[in-house]
A protein has these predicted regions:
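Short acidic (Asp/Glu) patches
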Residues: 46-52, 56-57, 79-82, 99
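Tight coil/turn sites that cap or link beta-strands
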Residues: 38-44, 91-92, 98-100
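A short, N-terminal "cap"/entry segment at the start of jelly-roll beta-barrel domains
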Residues: 1-53
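Conserved small/polar residues in nucleotide/adenosyl-binding loops
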Residues: 130-137
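Short, conserved beta-strand element in jelly-roll/cupin
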Residues: 57-72
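Short acidic-glycine-tyrosine-enriched beta hairpin
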Residues: 79-96
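A short hydrophobic beta-strand segment most commonly corresponding to one strand
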Residues: 110-128
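Short beta-strand His + acidic residue motifs that chelate non-heme Fe in jelly-roll/DSBH
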Residues: 72-73, 103-108, 116
Length: 137
């Protein structure tokens, strides 16, 4: 799994029932909070039940689970092993999803909360981010 990378957090301090984390991502210029209720799938399957995926050409994702569990499917034909299933929880660090990587995620049965500390370039267009036109980004 050498193609899959994580940005690990740094623990500043631990006290009873409290942990302080540094979750900085260098050059991040956007933060998205993604909340799944229950075992949600994003993007959802299409009308005939086929899987759908997101792909970004002007954004690198850094998806970090804040609460719950999330499983990502990643497809990148430039990797030695193009298909990966990656399970994340709070201790995993941020999953780095490079430009040009098809991806989708499924939450555990109790849902999940993820922060994506993205790095977006000047050609990023939020209007195309989550539509069927995203492949034309």
């Amino acid at each position: 799994m050498s193609d899959v990378e994580f940005k690990k957090h740094r623990v500043f301090r631990e006290t009873q029932d409290v942990i302080f984390y540094d979750i900085s991502v260098e050059d991040s210029n956007a933060s998205d909070l993604v909340v799944h209720e229950g075992s949600a799938v994003s993007p959802p399957d299409d009308s005939v039940g086929a899987k759908q995926f997101y792909i970004h050409y002007h954004q690198v994702d850094h998806n970090r689970v804040l609460k719950g569990e999330r499983t990502f499917e990643l497809v990148n034909v430039e990797w030695k092993y193009p298909y990966h299933i990656v399970h994340l929880n709070r201790s995993s660090g941020a999953l780095i999803i490079p430009r040009g990587t098809w991806h989708r995620s499924t939450s555990g049965e109790n849902g999940s909360i993820v922060i994506n500390q993205a790095i977006r370039d000047d050609l990023f267009n939020h209007c195309l981010l989550y539509t069927s036109d995203a492949a034309d980004e």
